[in-house]
């Protein structure tokens, strides 16, 4: 939607519609020129690109960081769950929910910079099997929130940081 129509029109009409060929994505999608990018829930690449017809491009986008421990495939997608922001053209910021790490990529998926901090922590995830169920839980000793709500405005990039331990009594995601 155009912003003016979205705000003022009681029945806005979409200017473009995309139907993705695959749907295993964790957070919102971003624009990179005429393509879409989404954070994946897969262990091979943290993101994938889709063309304007919604077809997934053959190669994944970006790379997962090396963590403090060797993760299983299930643990890596949980430990590095993320949300992204783009400048709409050629830059992507992947902001991690459970480690204070932001990965900056160019429009081709090449890592430009890894920003650690302000506290340099990793939440550790541990895979479990319970009958037919397989999952991954955060280790409570390390379970912390990191980055939320990234926004790209012009040449600037903004993101909220929490840093609190999730299992503390007065924990609040908002404060």
Report residues per predicted region:
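Solenoidal tandem-repeat scaffolds enriched in leucines and small polar residues
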Residues: 30, 36-64, 68, 77-79, ...
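Surface-exposed loop and turn segments in beta-propeller and other repeat-based domains
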Residues: 6-22, 57-77, 110-142
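Short glycine/acidic-enriched loop and turn motifs that connect beta-strands
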Residues: 42-46, 99-101, 164-167
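Structural signature of eukaryotic scaffold interfaces centered on beta-propeller domains
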Residues: 26-32, 76-89, 95, 141-153
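Entry beta-strands of beta-propeller and related beta-repeat scaffolds
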Residues: 35-37, 90-92, 155-159
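Long, acidic/polar, low-complexity amphipathic helices and coiled-coil-like
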Residues: 1-41
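Loop/turn-rich, solvent-exposed surfaces of beta-rich toroidal or solenoidal domains
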Residues: 135-175
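Beta-propeller blade signature
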Residues: 2-3, 47-52, 170-175
């Amino acid at each position: 939607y155009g912003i003016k129509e979205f705000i003022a029109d009681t029945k806005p009409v979409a200017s473009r519609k995309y139907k993705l060929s695959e749907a295993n994505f964790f957070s919102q999608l971003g624009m990179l020129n005429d393509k879409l990018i989404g954070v994946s829930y897969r262990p091979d690449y943290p993101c994938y690109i889709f063309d304007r017809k919604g077809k997934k491009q053959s190669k994944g986008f970006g790379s997962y960081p090396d963590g403090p421990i060797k993760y299983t495939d299930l643990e890596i997608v949980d430990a590095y769950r993320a949300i992204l922001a783009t400048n709409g053209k050629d830059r992507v910021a992947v902001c991690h929910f459970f480690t204070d790490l932001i990965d900056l990529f160019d429009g081709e998926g090449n890592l430009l910079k890894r920003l650690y901090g302000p506290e340099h922590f990793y939440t550790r995830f541990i895979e479990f099997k319970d009958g037919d169920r397989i999952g991954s839980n955060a280790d409570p000793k390390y379970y912390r929130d990191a980055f939320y709500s990234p926004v790209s405005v012009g040449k600037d990039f903004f993101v909220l940081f929490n840093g609190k331990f999730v299992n503390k009594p007065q924990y609040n995601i908002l404060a």
